[in-house]
Amino acid sequence: MNMSSTQQEHQAAPAAAKSAEETFEPKILAFCCNWCSYAGADLAGVSRLQMPTNFLVLRSMCSARVDPEFVLRAFAKGADGVLVLGCHPADCHYIGGNYRARRRIALLKMLLEHYGLDPDRLQLEWVSASEGVKFQSTITDFIE
């Protein structure tokens, strides 16, 4: 049976789409506090913990220094998810920066929902410098 090239392309399209879905790797951006979370990321790397490779870490001096515009721009530029990682409450190098970050993230989640984006694509987590395993699990769980 002979098929035209158009028919062959039409039949191959669903297979290609299915293959693309199976190999989808979300692009994740992680803003890490310099004093805790970034050191936790470093510990995870030095400990050779297995982590996905489809995330990018950006160091920020404090989780409160992550401007909402940075998050919105990340989504506009194609990020599938954004993590903001900071010091545990009461352990912030800048006293209350993590509390400020928590308020900002709550407002940003409402804004994302207003724009029709899933607010779960943005998360705030606390990771200390000694929590390399927690950094690994946070990244892995967020990507899954």
Where are these regions (language model features)?
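Iron-sulfur-associated redox domains of electron-transfer enzymes in respiratory
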Residues: 1-144
